[in-house]
Regions:
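Conserved Rossmann-fold cofactor-binding substructure of NAD(P)-dependent oxidoreductases
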Residues: 29-61
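ADP-ribose/adenylate-binding Rossmann-like module
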Residues: 57, 66-87
């Protein structure tokens, strides 16, 4: 890194951390702690201004770290897509973090930076109030073992109906009946004439839409609303109806697998936490987002 920043890498396995550190030309300090090691986590947080966490599933490994960050006035950033867990963080820590001036910023990976920041800049580029933003996503890549574990682990949790709430992460009283009526999750295939393409359900929409709606609600509290009764929706982008159909069927099959008795059997054949796509797959991966405002 060319920036004048003192940084370190942390994890539970010193030898693996040393292998990672060899990839950097600068001296990188190595810090060792497990997600359940309160003493080790306190040592890391007490010495850090910001902690960036990539260790999921976060509902298993992230809660103690967030609490210790706040205790030590340390900002926290992660890549979770687990909105039910983020909801718990908001309920437990939002007021105290705000009082201390500490930033707790979940969902800073593929979910949900493109959606959240893309919507922000799309709206701001018009320099006027906006009623609605629709985003359309296409991508190429493979999931890591941690992401796969997160998806399959949710079947063991009693999440209830709240997980389907389009405004799960919003502050209480921050949305209207009109907004709620126009914000239901999308499961159908539709022709998008403005794009000369087709849209269908997007695998990350359930996570991303909640984050975008919360961001807009928090901006509204600062008198920086996107627009009166603003709504946001998200779709997968497809060039043809047949591709939209195949993708939607695949997504439906995945959903059925995650709630079926066979999920543990299927899980055993897939990547484990700590495993990921090959370097070739990573280097050839991409995503594209289009915004209709």
């Amino acid at each position: 890194l060319e920036l004048d920043i003192k940084w370190a890498i942390a994890g539970r396995n010193p030898s693996k951390l040393e292998n990672v550190a060899r990839n950097f030309s600068t001296n990188v300090e190595i810090l060792v702690a497990d997600a359940d090691d309160e003493k080790g986590l306190k040592d890391i947080c007490s010495r850090s201004k910001v902690v960036l966490s990539t260790a999921g599933p976060f509902h298993r490994y992230g809660s103690k770290l967030v609490a210790i960050c706040i205790e030590n006035d340390t900002h926290y950033v992660d890549i979770t897509g687990e909105n039910f867990w983020v909801k718990g963080l908001i309920e437990k820590h939002h007021k105290e973090a705000a009082r201390r001036g500490i930033r707790i910023i979940p969902s800073c990976g593929f979910d949900s930076i493109p959606s959240d920041i893309g919507t922000f800049f799309a709206v701001r580029s018009l320099n006027k109030p906006v009623k609605r933003v629709d985003s359309f996503h296409s991508w190429k890549g493979e999931a890591s073992g941690g992401t796969i574990e997160t998806m399959f682990s949710m079947g063991d949790l009693n999440l209830g109906k709240d997980i389907r709430d389009p405004f799960l992460l919003n502050p209480e009283g921050s949305y209207t009946n009109e907004q709620k009526k126009l914000s239901s999750d999308v499961f159908k295939i539709s022709k998008q004439k403005d794009l000369n393409a087709w849209s269908g359900p997007f695998v990350m929409a359930g996570a991303n839409t909640r984050v975008v709606r919360r961001s807009e609600a928090l901006l509204t509290e600062r008198q920086e609303s996107y627009g009166n009764n603003f709504t946001y929706q998200e779709y997968a982008f497809h060039k043809s109806w047949s591709k939209a159909l195949l993708s939607t069927l695949g997504l439906g099959l995945l959903g059925l697998t995650l709630v079926s008795p066979l999920r543990k059997t299927v899980r055993s054949f897939l990547r484990k936490p700590g495993e990921g796509p090959s370097l070739e797959v990573q280097e050839n991966g991409w995503f594209d987002c289009k915004y209709l405002v």
